[in-house]
Regions:
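N-terminal single-pass transmembrane signal-anchor helix
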Residues: 2-35
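Short, acidic, Ser/Thr-enriched surface-loop or helix-capping motifs
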Residues: 8, 131, 171
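Polybasic/polar functional segments that serve as interface/processing modules
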Residues: 14-15, 32, 36-44, 50, ...
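Membrane-proximal N-terminal amphipathic helix
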Residues: 40-69
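Type IV pilin-like appendage domain
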Residues: 67-133, 166, 177
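Surface-exposed intrinsically disordered loops and tails
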Residues: 84-99, 138-156
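Small-residue (G/S/T/A) turn/hinge positions that recur once per unit in extracellular repeat modules
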Residues: 112-114, 119, 134-136, 143, ...
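Low-complexity, S/T/G/P-rich flexible repeat/linker segments used as non-globular hinges
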Residues: 135-137, 154-177
Length: 177
C-alpha cells in the first residue's frame, strides 16, 4: 500500500493548469472591461468639452465677433458656446450658439450622468472667453470680460462614482493641453 502511494503521481496535469489560466484570463478581461466602461463616459465628455473650448478659441481668432467663449453654470451642470462684444456685459441667453455636433444650444451634463464640480475661477457661473488673438479671459456672474487669464483655468467634471477629470486652459496662449 505504501508502495502504491509513491507510484501515483500527485499534482496537476498541463491541461488542468492551462484550463485554469484561460478561465482566470477571461474573468480578468471581463472585470477590466466593466471598470473601463465606467470611466469612458467621463473621459469622452471631458474630451468633448476640451474640443468645445478649442472651437470657441478658433472662432474668436477667425471671425469678426470680439469674443467667443464657453459659459459654465455649475449649479445646473451646463455649459454653452457664446459670442459677445469686448467691454460689454453679455446677454448670455441671447448670444448662445449651438456647438456643432450637439442638438441644443446648451450642453446639459446631467444627461450623461456627469456634473461640473468646480472651476478654478469664480463661483457658480463662470465664463471663459477668447479674444481675436486667442488670449483667454474669464469673468464671474455677469461681469464684463476684462480679466485676462493669469493662471491656468481648470474646470473639473465628475461622475456619480466621485471620479473626476480636469480640463485645463493655459494662460497667454489659451491652449488646451
Amino acid at each position: 500500500m505504501v508502495a502504491d502511494f509513491f507510484k501515483k503521481e500527485h499534482g496537476f496535469t498541463m491541461i488542468e493548469l492551462t484550463a485554469v489560466l484561460i478561465l482566470a484570463g477571461i474573468i480578468a478581461a471581463a472585470a477590466a472591461s466593466v471598470l473601463s466602461r465606467q470611466h469612458a463616459n467621463l473621459r469622452g465628455r471631458a474630451g468633448a468639452l476640451e474640443s468645445h473650448i478649442r472651437y470657441a478659441r478658433a472662432l474668436a481668432m477667425s471671425t469678426d465677433e470680439d469674443n467667443w467663449g464657453i459659459r459654465f453654470d455649475i449649479e445646473s451642470d451646463q455649459y454653452w458656446l457664446f459670442y459677445c462684444q469686448t467691454g460689454q456685459t453679455c446677454g448670455w441667453d441671447d448670444n448662445k450658439t449651438r456647438i456643432p455636433g450637439t442638438k441644443q444650444k446648451t450642453v446639459d451634463l446631467k444627461e450623461y450622468k456627469l456634473g461640473i464640480s468646480s472651476t478654478s475661477h469664480g463661483g457658480n457661473t463662470v465664463t471663459l472667453a477668447f479674444d481675436n488673438f486667442g488670449t483667454p479671459y474669464w469673468a464671474e456672474a455677469d461681469e464684463v470680460l476684462e480679466n485676462r487669464l493669469e493662471k491656468s483655468f481648470t474646470a473639473t467634471l465628475s461622475d456619480n462614482s466621485a471620479n473626476t477629470r480636469d480640463i485645463k486652459v493655459i494662460p497667454e496662449t489659451g491652449a488646451v493641453p
